[in-house]
Structures are given as structure tokens and as C-alpha cells.
């Protein structure tokens, strides 16, 4: 007789492992299967998904290391500190990154044991459905579950005609383990991954050129934020070419040649040592056997779900990158918790308008809610308040005075509709805005909250006060 569970989670990325842990906390008999070994030396399945193994966590480790190098080289002098010759040990830097990843994967294994989650090593594939539940093959063993949560995540999108070998031409995985700093680096795609990885290698010494098909930089972000971010990144040495069309990519003994047409229609050639292709991601739904349970992905590979992440098949759920909405780890985590609680009979709710976005360049870029362009398109009247970090004592003392906070509020009710930040610690500052918006706060609420002084968080308060043109320190 096959193993039987109340809940089976397919995929142990941020959405999947969090869903499994929450289901375990709620007293459900839960299992989670994962088959991807990533770079495990023994070839065994590793927990954490793309985010932990080849995405969010390792990239932030390298971003931190490269920021330290940048600071020593270019900013310690401002503090009266003189250093000698500074060198980069890429191998040691990569080992630090790998050690962090290993520590966190072991942490998830511990959390599974703590919450009585059964770990099944192997890819999950539906093979049928019976009165007992859904039947899923995991590494040759068929298990049965009354409820199944699909959390298989996504993979890098590859462009037709461009062979990604993760050597000379890399996606996000290969770009995290260059054995040496490339002299010249090309990046196709000025999205989150392209900007972050381009920043890492630029700080370490690469001459980085970013090619972007769209005519505008960071089109999803607030226009003012995008302009400020592009200005700061350009000042740091990143080169941008927007509105381009990549025609051909070839590799040879001297590196990579990219032929493209620029925004003016002129043919251009870019010669680089390595190339990163970061043009989005596609859902991992290819080999799930969805037809065996009466389900199918759409033309783009996404699984259709309702507002509660339920599919059209009762008892079958899907979360994270395989469903609608932004491909963000924290969005997947929230969906995982919500689905586990709904299976247990609770009635959770996710406000997708309050899901924050962060790009971990320097300065960081973060936002939540609506942009000015979106509010104008909706015909909604709003007020805007903006305050710069250059007027903040803590930011000046830290040498992080670039950027600003912009707050948008309803013209009549004063409800906060969006907050947009360019700042050294925007990823931390945005959390206050998320909490405020979850509780339908007004800009006046933030303006009347006492913020610690001196701190960069004061700029959030000043931006709130600026909504009614009553900022105090400008």
C-alpha cells in the first residue's frame, strides 16, 4: 500500500517548503517532494528551490561581498581611512556564498523534522486520482495525498538562437559562479537579475554593458525612481543601451560577440568575455503529468487558479511562480501559508496590492502599491510627497545620501496608495509602507508616528508629511 498523506507539496522552494511547514504546524500529515540537486556534491536533492540555491540568497551574498570591495576601494578614504593594495579572491568569495547556501538548506531540513514534514527526495509527477486522493510518482514510488500543492517554481527563459552553456553564455545560475572576474561582461536584460548580477561583477572590476529591448529603464517601476536608479547605476560605471534588438550571439576562443540593432536602427557589435542572458523566467510545469488529474497549463506554462490559489480540480492547489502575479519568493511564501491554512479550514486573505518589490542594486530600489502612471491611467486623484536622503543626517553620516522616498495618497481620503524608494536600505524601509498599506493607513498616520532620530526611517515620515506640503526638514 502506498504512503498516504493529508497534503503533498510538490517542490521545496520558498512557497513549497513554507506551505509544508505551515501545514505541519496545523496538525496535518504532510509530505514535500523535491528532486533538483542543484550543485550538491553528492547529487542529492537540495531544499530551498531556485531562490536559496541559485537565486535570491547566493546573489545577495555576492552583492554583499562586492559592496565590501567597492567600499574599501572607493569610499573608506572619505572616512579618513587609508588602505594599501586591495585584491579580490573570487574562489573564497564563491565559497562563502556556497557555505551560506549550505547552512540554509540544512536549516530547512531541520525545520521539516521539527514540524513533522516527511521529505521525499525525487521529482513529483501525477499518475492518477482515486477515492483516496491524488496519486503522485516520486522517484519510482507512488504516494497518495488528499490535497496537493504545486509549488514547482520557474526556470530562466532562454532566447531562441542563443545557446546558454553556463560557461561563456550564462543565465542566473552560471553568472553566480564565474571562476574569475571577466574583463568585459555583457548582460541581455535590464531586469532585476540582470541589474543585480551586472552590479556584482562591475564592482569587482568588469566593464559591464547592459542591453535592454524595452525603450524605458525599469518600466514597471515609478518613473522618477527608474530615472534616479539609472542615474546612480550609470555613475557607478554600468553602461546601458535601451530599445535594442539582439540579432545574433556567437562564441569563439576570444569570447562572445553580440550583434544587435540599437534604438536608432543602426547595426552594432559588442565584444565581451562573458555574456549573461536574463530575460525573465518561465514556469516549471512541463513534466508534472497534469493531464492525469484533469488539469492543463496555459500556453505560457502557467496554471490557472482563483483568488485563493485553488485550481479547477478540487483538492489541487498551485502557488508561486507557476501561477499569476509577480515571480517573487515572498509572494510565494504568503500563498503557501494561505493555502495550508485554507486546507485546515481557516479563511486567510492576501492583498496582492501590498506585495513589495525590491531590486538589490546599490542603492536599492523598492516599491509597493501603485505608481503615478497607474493612478493616472485609473483616473484616480492623488497627492504625492517626496523627500531626499541628502537632507537626512543619518544618511549623510553613513555616506548613503543618494535617493529619496516618494509617497502617493488618495486626494480625498489620504489613504496611502503607493510608496517608492531609492535608498541604501530600501529593502528594509519598504516594510513600514507595506504594514501601513495593509492597515489602510493614511499618509497623516505615518506623519504622526514618532520615528527614531537619527535614522534613515525619518525620510519615510518626511515623505508622508510632504504629501500635504508640511515636511519639516526641507
UniProtKB/Swiss-Prot annotation:
Q: Which UniProt keywords apply?
A: Cytoplasm, Disulfide bond, FAD, Flavoprotein, NAD, Oxidoreductase, Redox-active center
- For the ligand (FAD), the binding residues are 34-51, 60, 124, 321, 329
Disulfide-bonded cysteines: 51-56
What the entry lists under Pfam families is as follows: Pyr_redox_2, Pyr_redox_dim
Active-site residue list = 453 (proton acceptor)
Question: What EC number(s) does the entry state?
Answer: 1.8.1.4
Task: From the Swiss-Prot or TrEMBL record, state where the protein is found.
Answer: Cytoplasm
The cofactor required is: FAD
Chief place of localization: cytoplasm
**Coiled coil segments of this chain:** none
The UniProt similarity line reads: Belongs to the class-I pyridine nucleotide-disulfide oxidoreductase family.
Name of the molecule in the record: Dihydrolipoyl dehydrogenase
| Organism whose genome encodes this protein | Cupriavidus necator (strain ATCC 17699 / DSM 428 / KCTC 22496 / NCIMB 10442 / H16 / Stanier 337) (Ralstonia eutropha)
Recall the taxonomic lineage recorded for the source organism.
Answer: Bacteria, Pseudomonadati, Pseudomonadota, Betaproteobacteria, Burkholderiales
Amino acid at each position: 500500500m502506498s504512503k498516504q498523506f493529508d497534503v503533498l507539496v510538490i517542490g521545496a522552494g520558498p512557497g513549497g517548503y513554507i506551505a509544508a511547514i505551515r501545514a505541519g504546524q496545523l496538525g496535518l500529515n504532510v509530505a514535500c517532494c523535491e528532486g533538483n540537486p542543484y550543485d550538491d556534491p553528492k547529487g542529492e536533492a537540495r531544499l530551498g528551490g531556485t531562490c536559496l540555491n541559485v537565486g535570491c540568497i547566493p546573489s545577495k551574498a555576492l552583492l554583499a561581498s562586492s559592496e565590501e570591495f567597492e567600499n574599501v576601494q572607493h569610499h573608506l578614504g572619505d572616512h579618513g581611512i587609508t588602505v594599501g593594495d586591495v585584491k579580490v579572491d573570487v574562489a573564497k568569495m564563491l565559497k562563502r556564498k556556497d557555505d551560506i547556501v549550505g547552512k540554509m538548506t540544512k536549516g530547512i531540513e531541520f525545520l521539516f523534522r521539527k514540524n513533522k514534514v516527511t521529505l521525499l527526495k525525487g521529482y513529483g509527477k501525477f499518475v492518477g486520482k482515486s477515492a483516496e486522493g491524488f496519486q503522485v510518482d516520486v522517484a519510482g514510488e507512488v504516494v497518495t495525498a488528499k490535497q496537493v500543492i504545486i509549488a514547482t517554481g520557474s526556470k530562466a527563459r532562454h532566447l531562441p538562437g542563443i545557446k546558454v552553456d553556463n560557461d561563456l553564455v550564462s543565465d542566473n545560475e552560471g553568472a553566480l559562479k564565474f571562476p574569475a572576474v571577466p574583463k568585459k561582461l555583457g548582460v541581455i536584460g535590464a531586469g532585476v537579475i540582470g541589474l543585480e548580477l551586472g552590479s556584482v561583477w562591475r564592482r569587482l572590476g568588469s566593464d559591464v554593458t547592459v542591453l535592454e529591448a524595452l525603450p524605458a529603464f525599469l518600466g514597471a517601476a515609478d518613473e522618477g525612481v527608474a530615472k534616479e536608479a539609472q542615474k546612480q547605476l550609470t555613475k557607478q560605471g554600468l553602461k546601458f543601451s535601451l530599445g535594442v534588438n539582439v540579432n545574433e550571439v556567437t562564441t569563439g576562443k576570444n569570447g562572445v560577440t553580440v550583434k544587435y540593432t540599437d534604438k536608432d536602427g543602426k547595426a552594432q557589435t559588442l565584444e565581451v568575455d562573458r555574456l549573461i542572458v536574463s530575460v525573465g523566467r518561465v514556469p516549471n510545469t512541463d513534466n508534472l503529468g497534469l493531464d492525469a488529474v484533469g488539469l492543463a497549463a496555459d500556453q505560457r506554462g502557467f496554471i490557472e487558479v482563483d483568488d485563493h490559489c485553488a485550481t479547477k480540480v478540487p483538492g489541487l492547489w498551485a502557488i508561486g511562480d507557476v501561477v499569476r502575479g509577480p515571480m517573487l519568493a515572498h509572494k510565494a511564501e504568503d500563498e503557501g501559508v494561505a493555502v495550508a491554512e485554507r486546507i485546515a479550514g481557516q479563511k486567510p486573505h492576501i492583498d496582492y496590492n501590498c506585495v513589495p518589490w525590491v531590486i538589490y542594486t546599490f542603492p536599492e530600489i523598492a516599491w509597493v502599491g501603485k505608481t503615478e502612471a497607474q493612478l493616472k491611467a485609473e483616473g484616480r486623484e492623488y497627492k504625492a510627497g517626496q523627500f531626499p536622503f541628502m537632507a537626512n543626517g543619518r544618511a549623510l553620516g553613513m555616506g548613503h545620501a543618494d535617493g529619496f522616498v516618494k509617497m502617493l495618497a488618495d486626494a480625498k481620503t489620504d489613504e496611502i496608495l503607493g510608496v517608492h524608494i531609492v535608498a541604501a536600505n530600501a529593502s528594509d524601509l519598504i516594510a513600514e509602507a507595506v504594514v501601513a498599506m495593509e492597515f489602510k493607513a493614511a499618509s497623516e498616520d505615518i506623519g504622526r508616528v514618532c520615528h527614531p532620530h537619527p535614522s534613515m526611517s525619518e525620510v519615510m515620515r518626511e515623505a508622508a508629511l510632504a504629501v500635504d506640503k508640511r515636511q519639516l526638514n526641507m
